[in-house]
A protein has these predicted regions:
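Serine-hydrolase catalytic-loop signature spanning alpha/beta hydrolases and amidase-signature enzymes
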Residues: 37-45, 57
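Helix-rich cap/lid subdomain of alpha/beta-hydrolase
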Residues: 132-201
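Post-His helix in hydrolase/transferase enzymes
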Residues: 246-255
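Active-site glycine-rich loops that stabilize anionic/oxyanionic intermediates
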Residues: 35-39, 104-105
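Conserved hydrolase catalytic core segment
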Residues: 96-132
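Active-site loop/oxyanion-hole signature of alpha/beta-hydrolase fold enzymes
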Residues: 56, 62-99, 112-119
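Conserved serine/cysteine hydrolase catalytic core
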Residues: 170, 174, 178-247
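Cleavable N-terminal signal peptides of Sec/SRP-targeted secreted and luminal proteins
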Residues: 5-26
Length: 255
C-alpha cells in the first residue's frame, strides 16, 4: 500500500514538473511601446489577450505620455522621451530576453532600445510605421513665441477619426480624444543626432514588420519601400485594419 502511495506521489510530481517546464517554455515577456500622444492605455485590448495565453506583459508610458508625470516641455531631448523604456530595459537581468512591440512612432523608442540592449531582446515587432503628411486639426504650440519653432503638437479629433481610428470602434476613438497628450516637436535632426543605429547591435535583433491594408497615414508603396530597405526577418499583413491595429484587430495582432 505504501509503495503504491509513493509511486502515485512520484507520478504526480513528475507530471507537475513536466507541465511546469512546458509552461515556462511557452511564456514570453512582451513589452508594449505606444505611439505619439498615446500611452499604455492604448494596449488595453491586447494585454488581457496576451496574459490569457500565459505570457507576461509590460505596457508603460513614455515620458510626458499617459499618466507619466513629466510635462511635455520637460522632455526637450529625444533621450528624455525614451527614458522610461531605457530605464526598464536596463533593469532587466542579462540572462532574460523580452519581445519588444512598438506601434508607429513607438518604433523609434524601440529602435533606440535595440541599439543599446540587443542582448536582452529576442525579437522586435514594428506595428505599422510613423505618420507624416496632412495632420488636419492637430494643434501646434509655440511656447517660445510665434517666431520660433513649434514646441509641441497634440493630435486633433478629426485627424484621429479620419487617419488613425477610421475602422476602430467609436468607443476607442472617444477614449483616445480624451486621453491623448501633447508630444514634443522633435525634428528630424534631433532623431539623427540621438538615434544612431548600427548593424552590429540594432541589426543583430530579429525584426518583424506588421502592416495593415487600410492604414491611411502610409500608402502601400511606402510600406513596401520600408520592407525592402529595412530587411525584416518576417512581414505580416493584417486585412481590414486601420493604423490602430491593437484597437481595430487585436485578435489578429495577437495571432
Amino acid at each position: 500500500m505504501e509503495t503504491k502511495k509513493v509511486y502515485s506521489l512520484f507520478s504526480f510530481l513528475l507530471i507537475f514538473l513536466v507541465f511546469s517546464v512546458n509552461l515556462a517554455r511557452s511564456e514570453s515577456h512582451f513589452v508594449l511601446v505606444h505611439t505619439a500622444g498615446h500611452g499604455a492605455w492604448c494596449w488595453y485590448k491586447l494585454v488581457p489577450l496576451l496574459k490569457s495565453t500565459g505570457h507576461n506583459v509590460t505596457a508603460f508610458d513614455l515620458a510626458a505620455s499617459g499618466i507619466n508625470p513629466k510635462h511635455v516641455l520637460d522632455v526637450p531631448f529625444v533621450s528624455d522621451y525614451f527614458r522610461p523604456l531605457t530605464e526598464f530595459m536596463a533593469s532587466i537581468p542579462r540572462h532574460e530576453k523580452v519581445i519588444l512591440v512598438g506601434h508607429s512612432y513607438g518604433g523609434l523608442a524601440m529602435s533606440h532600445a535595440m541599439e543599446r540592449f540587443p542582448e536582452k531582446i529576442s525579437v522586435a515587432v514594428f506595428v505599422t510605421t510613423r505618420s507624416e503628411g496632412d495632420y488636419l486639426d492637430t494643434r501646434v504650440a509655440y511656447d517660445n513665441g510665434p517666431k520660433n519653432p513649434p514646441t509641441s503638437y497634440t493630435l486633433g479629433s478629426k485627424y484621429m477619426s479620419e487617419k488613425l481610428y477610421q475602422l476602430s470602434p467609436i468607443d476607442d476613438l472617444t477614449l483616445a480624444t480624451m486621453l491623448v497628450r501633447p508630444l514634443y516637436a522633435y525634428t528630424t535632426q534631433d532623431f539623427a543626432r540621438e538615434l544612431k543605429l548600427s548593424g552590429d547591435k540594432y541589426g543583430s535583433v530579429s525584426r518583424i514588420f506588421i502592416m495593415t491594408d487600410k492604414d491611411k497615414i502610409r500608402q502601400k508603396n511606402f510600406q513596401h519601400w520600408m520592407i525592402e530597405h529595412n530587411g525584416p526577418n518576417k512581414v505580416k499583413f493584417i486585412k481590414g485594419s486601420d493604423n490602430m491595429v491593437m484597437m481595430s484587430k487585436p485578435k489578429e495582432l495577437l495571432a
